[in-house]
UniProtKB/Swiss-Prot annotation:
The keyword Transmembrane does not apply. It comes from Homo sapiens (Human). The lineage of its organism: Eukaryota, Metazoa, Chordata, Craniata, Vertebrata. Residues 8-85 form the RRM domain. Disulfide bonds: none annotated. Residues 80-349, 452-496 are annotated as: Disordered. One of its GO terms (molecular function) is RNA binding. InterPro entries: Nucleotide-bd_a/b_plait_sf, RBD_domain_sf, RBM, RBM1CTR, RRM_dom. Pfam families: RBM1CTR (PF08081), RRM_1 (PF00076). This is RNA-binding motif protein, Y chromosome, family 1 member C. PROSITE patterns: RRM. GO terms for biological process: mRNA processing; positive regulation of mRNA splicing, via spliceosome; regulation of RNA splicing; RNA splicing. The keyword rRNA-binding does not apply. RNA-binding protein involved in pre-mRNA splicing. Required for sperm development. Acts additively with TRA2B to promote exon 7 inclusion of the survival motor neuron SMN. Binds non-specifically to mRNAs.
Length: 496
């Protein structure tokens, strides 16, 4: 509902941008005395094309509206009508007339200046809180741009721009700057070292596990939880020395492994006596090399092989575990029986079984694709088992594949001798040597602890398979371990 504003107030629209207050007063002053001329301007003090003129006599205002409406002024047709109040302001709050206090000293002419068409610093006679937009003509021309800044609050009374307008603009600028800086910092964080390092390490583990663990992917990556419980860690007497070796091995193998269980460093404790300690040092070194080619080492394999407490029996019993490790190296799912069957016997032989087993198992896992490591490590341990010292073994780490190790005094146990440690030395040299010795030492396991093997050790031609038949041969050795005697290879490949 539109109400007429002050009867003597006219709205003049469609003005030329060059028309100023003096021109308006000169043109409309012909119809009667003018109390006020209000030209609406923008922030640059340029005319926005409309103005308000207040006549002292309302009758003069009506005559001027009839006479000047639709006529051309400075090249543009203008509209002259009675100023109207906005519909949403009808019956609303009213302020006392402000024209008297805002009128210029001459009392005749004043130009209201403000941003967005608002009449800041000057208010009309009746609706003081409304500016140019508060007075719309009968044509209902929209001046909403003038209404918005004026309704902000009492700041429109003052002559300057309202603080509520400047403050949000500053905040907006700061927010926009921060928003532009935000993505940069985020992008900078996205290229941080830890994420890239995790990506590379995970890629490396995936590639390594699929390439080097082709025969035992499930065994290396996902061991059964039953096998983790089978063999308890050794007594605390070995704990301190164990940490020294485990730290060294962990650092050497961390380049290819992502998750090393804390129990590995704890469970492979070196023995308390000198001779077995040297042996166990070898097994840890081998473990570190071979573990580099596997993705995850299960904690069960670390717990299974407790360090020996006595020297010579530890070697002997290691051979039986050695064959089991060969078989397990190529089997996807080792049964829990395989770890439980070879539970340590009485204390005299308990740790002997598990002394070289860690060395054997790891070397069997790594030798198929990395002959350099498997060869050198196998040679070291075969020499060490045959009686050479730890230092001699270390001197032969860099030897070629074809060079046989130095033959030390052959070790005997219960009358059976250890043979064929240096008989064959091809790409798979160390593993085939251990096969040849399995005929002698394997029979000192859980069922034949101290029984001397009466049979001759199997010949290399019979025991050694073709290198292309690595899977079958490993199953063959696993069958030897499970049954306690030599069996035929056929049918054992079904374990895969």
């Amino acid at each position: 509902m539109v109400e007429a504003d002050h009867p003597g107030k006219l709205f003049i629209g469609g003005l030329n941008r060059e028309t100023n207050e003096k021109m308006l007063k000169a043109v409309f002053g012909k119809h009667g005395p003018i109390s006020e001329v209000l030209l609406i301007k923008d922030r640059t003090s340029k005319s926005r094309g409309f103005a308000f003129i207040t006549f002292e006599n309302p009758a003069d205002a009506k005559n001027a509206a009839k006479d000047m409406n639709g006529k051309s002024l400075h090249g543009k047709a203008i509209k002259v009508e009675q100023a109207q109040k906005p519909s949403f302001q009808s019956g609303g709050r009213r302020r006392p007339p402000a024209s008297s206090r805002n009128r210029s000293p001459s009392g005749s002419l004043r130009s209201a200046r403000g941003s967005r068409g608002g009449t800041r610093g000057w208010l009309p006679s009746h609706e003081g809180h409304l500016d140019d937009g508060g007075y719309t003509p009968d044509l209902k021309m929209s001046y909403s741009r003038g209404l918005i800044p004026v309704k902000r609050g009492p700041s429109s009374r003052s002559g300057g721009p309202p603080p509520k307008k400047s403050a949000p603009s500053a905040v907006a600028r700061s927010n926009s700057w921060m928003g532009s800086q935000g993505p940069m910092s985020q992008r900078r964080e996205n290229y941080g070292v830890p994420p890239r390092r995790a990506t590379i390490s995970s890629w490396r583990n995936d590639r390594m596990s699929t390439r080097h663990d082709g025969y035992a992917t499930n065994d290396g990556n996902h061991p059964s939880c039953q096998e983790t419980r089978d063999y308890a860690p050794p007594s605390r007497g070995y704990a301190y020395r164990d940490n020294g070796h485990s730290n060294r091995d962990e650092h050497s193998s961390r380049g290819y492994r992502n998750h090393r269980s804390s129990r590995e460093t704890r469970d492979y404790a070196p023995p308390s006596r000198g001779h077995a300690y040297r042996d166990y040092g070898h097994s840890r070194r081998d473990e570190s090399y071979s573990r580099g080619y596997r993705n995850r080492r299960s904690s069960r394999e670390t717990r299974e092989y407790a360090p020996p407490s006595r020297g010579h029996g530890y070697r002997d019993y290691g051979h039986s575990r050695r064959h089991e490790s060969y078989s397990r190296g190529y089997r996807n799912h080792p049964s829990s029986r395989e770890t439980r069957d070879y539970a340590p016997p009485h204390r005299d032989y308990a740790y002997r079984d598990y002394g070289h087993s860690s060395w054997d198992e790891h070397s069997s896992r790594g030798y198929s694709y990395h002959d350099g490591y498997g060869e050198a490590l196998g040679r070291d341990h075969s020499e060490h088992l045959s009686g050479s010292s730890y230092r001699d073994a270390l001197q032969r780490y860099g030897t070629s594949h074809g060079a046989p190790p130095a033959r030390g005094p052959r070790m005997s146990y219960g009358g059976s001798t250890c043979h064929a440690y240096s008989n064959t030395r091809d790409r798979y040299g160390r593993s085939w040597e251990s096969y040849s010795s399995c005929g002698d030492f394997h029979y000192c396991d859980r069922e034949h602890v101290c029984r001397k093997d009466q049979r001759n050790p199997p010949s290399l031609g019979r025991v050694l398979p073709d290198p292309r038949e690595a899977c079958g041969s490993s199953s063959y050795v696993a069958s030897i371990v499970d049954g306690g005697e030599s069996r035929s290879e056929k049918g054992d490949s079904s374990r895969y």
